[in-house]
Amino acid sequence: MAVPIVEMIDIQKHFGHIIALSGVSFSVMPGECHCLLGDNGAGKSTFIKTMAGVHAPTHGEMKVNGETAHFANPRDAMSAGIATVYQDLAVIPLMSVSRNFWMGREPERGVWPFRTIDFKMADRVAMQEMSHMGINLREPEQAVGTLSGGERQTVAIARAVYFGAKVLILDEPTSALGVRQTANVLATIDQVRKKGIGVVFITHNVRHAMAVGDRFTVLNRGKTLGTADRGKISADELQNLMAGGQELAQLESSLGGTV
Amino acid sequence: MTMPSTVAAPLMHTARDERIKRMSKFRRAIIRPELGAICGTVAVFAFFFVLAGGTAMFTLEGAMSWSTVSAQFVVLAVGVCLLMIAGEFDLSLGSMVGFSGMIFALLTIALGLPVWLSILLALTLACALGAINGILVVRTGLPSFIVTLAFMFILRGLTIWSAISLTRQTVVSGMGEAAANDPLARLFGGKVLTGLFQWLANHGVIATFARGARAGQPVVEGIPMLIVWAIGLLIFGQWLLTRTKFGNWIFATGGDPQAARYIGVPVTRVKIIMFMFASLCAAVLGISQVVEFGSAAADRGLMKEFEAIICVVIGGALLTGGYGSVIGAALGAVIFGVVQQGLFFTNVESSLFRVFLGSILLGAVIANTYIRRLITGER
Ligand SMILES: Nc1ncnc2c1ncn2[C@@H]1O[C@H](COP(=O)(O)OP(=O)(O)OP(=O)(O)O)[C@@H](O)[C@H]1O
Ligand SMILES: [Mg+2]
């Protein structure tokens, strides 16, 4: 079997006396879309933040391409090829689309110490990538605050894809989107996956998950209820699992690859 | 670092979005963060031109006086502006003006160090104290308002205490002679372009003293170094903020520190560096005042932090960070300087200075809020 791009083994995360994650294992293969489902407060965001270098896990091991990795900060995770689009903190509203797009990786020109941002190139690429995602901007200097919630998410997704992430983590990217933009994001996930990038797709919406997912993992109160492959589980079964797993016993047979 | 890649459009839109209104070039050119400050500056000059057009205010000599006062505000405002955009305040900057000047004077007079060494030590100390402020703020997560308020008292207290315990006075004089021939002190005091001004005077372009010891010399000898500092800092600040990667990080740090951190911006480093830079600006002002006046006084810089904050806010910066303009802040400083000196020329009751300033502050801030909403789409 191929080596997962990222593998998380028995991850625990405690915030003081709150146990947000109590032993979650999870992996992403190249070119797959692994959906992470769960109710509010299940620990999905906390889990992907440990993957993205925001939180250090209290316990557990993390492997990138089969080798143990420790991320001290989000920059480390980014340079390992893990890009994340956060649920609520994707972009900075007061700043322009172009500046947001390039944040942290600004293209520079000139001689040190007089290096400046290459605005011409930055603006052109930002406009182009945004229009690929179906969003037409008035100008690259347009502030992100003037965009709708969905358009803001799209800026962050376009950015992550452009910078050639190996793993793209999307925390509820479709929760604020309308029909057309959701279709766009799902189509983008599909394309990203075809390029061999592993996608971690967090959602509450089982239909969105079923549309693109290759594997499904359900989190509940900081624990995994199991991982199922595409075609081995129905939308109804997933829905029930998310709702608290009352019918877990009945579903156990369908969860072939239970961790 | 990574390979840029392009994803073909799932739903490609080639046509212009029909819901986007075209914005005229003119509208785009004038809707900018500095607009409020530009209007304010025009209003203030118009006001004084009517009231004091015939006085010395609009002679070269008068212009030099309000320019010098404005320059003091600019030097501080540039530091405060960048720090405020990064999302923090420093209320200890006024005390830092007094403190750095006093340290400079005491090292020279009481300890007998060479002037250039005292200047370097005072600047280094200011940077270090700025860093301590910054580290305390980012490590404790306390509002910078509280942390730097504490430093406002601590530094002012240390200034008075060190002066009294070393010299038994709160004013340390004798710096004029000490700094007279020092190579580094020349950067902080005196005037530049004196040759040009003398030449202009010889050709009758600017007036000369008719009598006395300085007969034949121009009434304005040159451009004070402080104005050179102000212009230099203004250009540097504006360039840093709007053209460089670090400037992008300053905006991001103040705009949304959490989002900035997640995307890989070293937020704590940016904040600490901005605290250091603001302290450095205060120290430059403190040292140049000492060189200029020939003495250090323990009460220098009193209330200067608030005045600088007012300049920056008039200039269009958002008090909560993430938005602002260095040029705007400098215009705010000019408004401040012109009003302060203008009321002196017009012989208006100086208490009216505050009334006038308060009104301008209010007007500019209301205008700025409106402009900012237009630009950023804040709801
Ligand atoms: N920094 C923190 N400090 C303390 N507790 C936290 C912190 N972050 C998360 N938690 C707790 O961990 C639990 C999981 O939160 P998390 O944000 O991961 O949920 P989620 O599955 O993403 O929910 P949602 O679907 O609403 O986004 C919650 O009970 C939350 O209160
Ligand atoms: Mg969440």
Mark where each language-model region is.
Chain A
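Glycine-rich phosphate-binding loops of nucleotide-dependent enzymes
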Residues: A2-V259
